[in-house]
C-alpha cells in the first residue's frame, strides 16, 4: 500500500496500485497501518487476491457490447478540435439505407453470439454528423429497435421538432455538444464551414429536449473555454440538463493542439465547476452529474460499476466497444478513424471476431499502464489509465507514451478522494448508481 496526499486536512489515501484497493487514513495512524499493527492491513491481505481477480476481469475479460456507428463521413460543421480529418468531413460519403440496414443485421448477429440473453447491445450513431443521413438512421432505428439500445450523438443543428419527436418517442438517447454559456465563447471552436457559430441553434434544440430524461450535453474543455466552466454548469442546471460531460480535449490531430490548455489551470477551473454543481444541488435538490468525473468516482468506490472506459488501461477501445466507419471499416474507437494503421478490417468482408483479434486492434487492447513510463510507477494508475492511446500515438509518438495530460487526471483523483473523505460523493453520482452492487470490503 502506498500513501498519497489528497489535499485533505484530516486524511491521506492508502492505495494498492495493482488492485486499486484504497483506504483513507489519518496521518497519525499511517505508520501503524504500514507496519501491520492495524486490522485494516490484515483484513485487506485476506481479500487482496479477490481484488486482483476483479481488476483482471475488468481490464482483460470484457467483450464489446457497443458500437460507435458513423452513418456518414460528412459534417456541416468545421470544429477546431475534431478528430475526423477535414477532407472526410467536407467531401465524404453517406452510407446508403440498404447498406446501413445490412450493417445492423451483421452487428445483431455478432452480438447474439456474444452478449448474454436479456442484455441489449448499444448502437450510438456518431460522427461527423449522423443526422445528415437522417432517413437511413431512422430506418435503422425502426427496423432494429428490438435488437439494440440506440443513441445519437449530434451537434444539434438538425434537431428540429420532427427529429426530436421521432427520437424521443423511441427512447433514443441523445447527446449534443455545447462548449460555453455564451455565443462569444462557444462559437470560438464550434462553427460551420462559413465560420459562423451555431450557439443559437443548440439552445433551440435544448429547449425541445427539456423534460426528456435521456439526453446529455458534452462540453469539450479547451484553452478557449476553461475559464467559463463554472458558468457552464450553472447554464446546464438552469436548463434542466439531466447529465453533462466536461471532457478535456483529445489532441489526436494537430488542430486540437492549438487549443490545448495546460494541466494545472484546466484542473483548477474544472474542479471549481464541480464545486459549483454541489452548491446547486444543495440549493435545489437536483443533481447535475458530470459524467466523466462521476466515472472517476465510480472507479474508486465501485470499480466494476463504471460506465465509461477511457480512464482504465487497456481502455475500452476494441474490447468494450468499437467504431464503424461509413464504408464498413472497423476501428478500435472513433478517435482512430482516419488513422489507417488502426483499421482492423471491414464489417462487410470479415467476421467481427476476426477483426477484434487483428494487430490493429491489439495495439490498443494490449496497451497498458505497466508498459508506460512514468505511469508504471504511479499510485493512481488504475483510476486514470493514461488516456488516450490515439493521442499518445499521434501526438507523442507511440503507444508506450503518455497522452496529452497527466496532472489534470491526478488532480481529479485527489479531488474525488476529498469528496469521499467528506461524505459528499453521492451528490456527484447518478441516482441509483449503487443498485445491484455489493460490498466486497468493509473497513474494520
Task: Describe the residue ranges of each PLM region.
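Conserved, mostly hydrophobic/aromatic
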Residues: 75, 79, 125, 152, ...
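Radical SAM enzyme [4Fe-4S]-AdoMet core and its adjacent flexible, acidic
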Residues: 188-200, 207, 211-317, 323, ...
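Flexible mid-to-C-terminal extensions adjoining Fe-S/redox cofactors in radical SAM and related proteins
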Residues: 337-444
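Residue-level structural signal for beta-strand termini and adjacent loop
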Residues: 27-28, 136, 336
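Radical SAM/AdoMet-radical enzyme domain recognition
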Residues: 101-124, 133-249, 256-259
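A broadly conserved sequence feature marking short terminus-proximal activation segments
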Residues: 32-49, 324-356, 362
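Canonical Radical SAM [4Fe-4S] cluster-binding loop centered on the CxxxCxxC motif
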Residues: 62-99
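N-terminal [4Fe-4S]-dependent radical SAM core
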Residues: 2-68, 114-117
Amino acid at each position: 500500500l502506498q500513501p498519497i496526499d489528497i489535499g485533505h486536512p484530516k486524511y491521506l489515501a492508502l492505495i494498492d496500485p495493482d488492485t486499486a484497493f484504497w483506504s483513507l487514513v489519518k496521518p497519525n495512524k499511517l505508520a501503524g497501518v504500514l507496519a501491520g499493527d492495524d486490522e485494516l492491513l490484515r483484513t485487506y491481505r485476506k481479500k487482496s487476491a479477490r481484488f486482483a481477480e476483479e481488476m483482471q476481469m475488468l481490464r482483460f475479460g470484457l467483450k464489446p457490447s457497443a458500437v460507435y456507428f458513423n452513418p456518414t463521413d460528412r459534417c456541416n460543421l468545421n470544429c477546431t478540435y475534431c478528430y475526423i480529418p477535414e477532407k472526410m468531413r467536407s467531401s465524404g460519403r453517406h452510407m446508403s439505407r440498404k447498406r446501413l440496414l445490412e450493417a445492423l443485421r451483421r452487428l445483431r448477429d455478432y452480438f447474439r453470439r456474444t452478449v448474454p440473453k436479456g442484455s441489449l447491445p448499444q448502437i450510438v450513431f456518431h460522427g461527423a454528423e449522423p443526422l445528415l443521413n437522417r432517413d437511413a438512421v431512422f430506418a435503422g432505428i425502426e427496423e432494429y429497435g428490438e435488437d439494440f439500445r440506440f443513441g445519437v450523438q449530434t451537434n444539434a443543428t438538425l434537431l428540429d421538432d420532427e427529429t426530436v419527436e421521432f427520437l424521443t418517442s423511441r427512447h433514443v438517447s441523445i447527446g449534443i455538444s455545447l462548449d460555453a454559456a455564451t455565443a462569444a465563447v462557444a462559437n470560438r471552436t464550434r462553427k460551420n464551414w462559413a465560420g459562423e457559430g451555431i450557439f443559437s441553434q443548440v439552445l433551440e434544440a435544448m429547449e425541445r429536449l427539456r423534460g426528456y430524461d435521456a439526453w446529455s450535453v458534452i462540453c469539450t474543455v479547451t484553452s478557449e473555454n476553461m475559464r467559463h466552466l463554472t458558468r457552464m454548469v450553472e447554464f446546464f442546471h438552469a436548463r434542466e440538463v439531466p447529465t453533462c460531460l466536461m471532457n478535456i480535449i483529445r489532441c489526436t490531430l494537430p488542430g486540437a493542439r492549438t487549443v490545448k490548455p495546460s494541466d494545472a489551470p484546466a484542473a483548477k477551473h474544472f474542479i471549481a465547476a464541480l464545486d459549483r454543481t454541489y452548491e446547486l444541488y444543495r440549493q435545489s435538490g437536483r443533481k447535475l452529474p458530470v459524467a466523466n468525473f462521476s466515472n472517476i468516482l465510480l472507479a474508486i468506490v465501485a470499480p466494476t460499476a463504471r460506465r465509461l472506459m477511457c480512464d482504465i488501461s487497456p481502455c475500452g477501445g476494441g474490447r468494450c466497444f468499437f467504431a464503424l466507419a461509413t464504408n464498413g471499416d472497423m476501428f478500435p474507437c472513433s478517435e482512430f478513424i482516419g488513422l489507417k494503421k488502426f483499421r482492423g478490417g471491414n464489417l462487410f468482408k470479415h467476421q467481427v471476431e476476426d477483426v477484434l483479434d487483428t494487430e490493429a486492434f491489439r495495439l490498443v487492447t494490449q496497451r497498458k499502464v505497466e508498459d508506460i513510463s512514468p505511469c508504471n510507477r504511479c499510485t493512481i494508475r488504475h483510476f486514470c489509465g493514461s488516456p488516450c492511446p490515439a493521442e499518445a500515438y499521434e501526438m507523442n509518438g507511440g503507444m508506450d507514451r503518455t497522452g496529452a495530460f497527466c496532472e489534470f487526471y491526478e488532480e481529479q483523483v485527489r479531488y474525488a478522494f476529498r469528496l469521499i473523505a467528506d461524505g459528499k460523493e453521492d451528490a456527484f453520482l447518478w441516482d441509483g448508481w449503487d443498485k445491484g452492487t455489493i460490498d466486497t470490503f468493509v473497513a474494520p
